[in-house]
Design a protein with these regions (language model features):
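Interdomain helical connector at the RecA1-RecA2 junction of SF1/SF2 helicase-like NTPases
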Residues: 1-46
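Hydrophobic alpha-helical scaffolding
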Residues: 7, 11-14, 52, 56, ...
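Structural motif corresponding to the C-terminal cap of alpha-helices
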Residues: 25-36, 70, 96-109
């Protein structure tokens, strides 16, 4: 079945769907994604994961459900929301970079652009993105390189970061994006030599 954007957004907001996506990710992370022999499966050192949520409420629900799915219901560090309403977002981003216990960050757009989290190994999309420039920026969060020793400082069971995984729960990779032309500004003329 092909879903409309509205139907798709409803399905990812549904707590049962969020739970299913997170359980599927949890079950695949060491069996299908990070299954190299030198990487010991350890959910306490889940690869640093950034989840893109639709809005603030969606992010809150994802955090709540992720705590249950990953067995960290009484842990306020393992999975956290980084949004404009989360308090000191710069400090949260810094903690996500360096704190071994902070494994999953959930954001709407705050960490989508211009933020460097080198040990990030997984991007999980639970929202669609129509804008090509925004989508490219969001994907760019995963391509940052990091030295092996630096990675192991925050993810002790990691060996090296040779790639990152983009987990597409909503079909974000399957459709064309829009490039909005600039408005109310000077036009750009391209000259090539």
């Amino acid at each position: 079945k092909n879903y409309t954007k509205e139907e798709l957004n409803r399905s990812i907001i549904n707590p049962a769907q969020i739970k299913l996506v997170l359980e599927t990710y949890r079950d695949a992370v060491y069996s299908e994604m990070f299954n190299e022999p030198q990487r010991e499966p350890d959910m306490n050192y889940l690869p640093k994961t950034l989840i893109f949520a639709l809005n603030e409420n969606h992010a809150t629900n994802i955090v709540r459900i992720a705590k249950k799915v990953f067995g960290h219901e009484n842990d306020d560090t393992f999975v956290q929301k980084i949004t404009y309403s989360s308090g000191d977002s710069n400090e949260l981003i810094r903690q996500f970079r360096v704190n071994r216990e902070f494994r999953i960050a959930v954001t709407c757009t705050l960490v989508a652009t211009g933020t460097d989290v080198k040990p990030l190994e997984v991007l999980l999309f639970m929202r669609d993105v129509a804008s090509e420039p925004l989508y490219i920026q969001m994907k760019g969060r995963g391509v940052r390189t990091i030295g092996d020793e630096q990675l192991r400082n925050v993810t002790p069971n990691a060996f090296s970061k040779d790639c990152f995984f983009l987990v597409d729960a909503v079909g974000v990779t399957e459709h064309d994006k829009k490039i909005t032309p600039p408005s109310d500004g000077p036009t750009t003329k391209l000259i090539t030599f």
